[in-house]
């Protein structure tokens, strides 16, 4: 049964401005440490925009937004063996997922020229 669903569209230009102004500091503020290691040197802005879209969709699925002690670094976008994105929640985000009774996550992520979009589904 679906217990949460979230969707987000992130403008790549908005992420590019943060990257241009703060660089690695911007990335470390929104990425989990495992994601920082996986961030490609080529086109980091598209990577950041995609990860941010998933994180926004995830907090919508959790029903919390970025509040109650849940921040972007509590949500990790990992990579499944076949290469698909997968959600790994940490800290209060993981506790909220457990409180919802969710045991599975589904993530869809896509990039266009100007945007990155993501859908997250939480399932019990």
Swiss-Prot record:
GO terms for biological process: fatty acid biosynthetic process. InterPro entries: 4-PPantetheinyl_Trfase_dom, 4-PPantetheinyl_Trfase_dom_sf, ACPS, Ppantetheine-prot_Trfase_dom. It comes from Nitratidesulfovibrio vulgaris (strain ATCC 29579 / DSM 644 / CCUG 34227 / NCIMB 8303 / VKM B-1760 / Hildenborough). It catalyses: apo-[ACP] + CoA = holo-[ACP] + adenosine 3',5'-bisphosphate + H(+). Belongs to the P-Pant transferase superfamily. AcpS family. This is Holo-[acyl-carrier-protein] synthase. It comes from the Bacteria. Its cofactor is Mg(2+). Its EC number is 2.7.8.7. Transfers the 4'-phosphopantetheine moiety from coenzyme A to a Ser of acyl-carrier-protein. It is found in: Cytoplasm. It holds the Pfam family ACPS. One of its GO terms (molecular function) is magnesium ion binding. One of its GO terms (cellular component) is cytoplasm. Keywords: Cytoplasm, Fatty acid biosynthesis, Fatty acid metabolism, Lipid biosynthesis, Lipid metabolism, Magnesium, Metal-binding, Transferase. It is an enzyme of class 2 (transferase).
């Amino acid at each position: 049964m679906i217990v949460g669903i979230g969707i987000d569209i992130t403008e790549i230009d908005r992420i590019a401005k943060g990257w241009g102004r703060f660089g690695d500091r911007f990335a470390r503020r929104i990425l989990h440490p495992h994601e920082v290691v996986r961030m490609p040197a080529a086109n980091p802005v598209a990577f950041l925009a995609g990860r941010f879209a998933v994180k926004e969709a995830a907090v919508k699925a959790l029903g919390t937004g970025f509040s109650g002690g849940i921040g972007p670094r509590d949500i990790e976008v990992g990579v499944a063996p076949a290469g698909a994105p997968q959600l790994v929640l940490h800290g209060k985000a993981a506790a909220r997922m457990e409180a919802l009774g969710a045991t599975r996550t589904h993530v869809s992520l896509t990039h266009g020229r100007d945007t990155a979009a993501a859908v997250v589904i939480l399932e019990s």
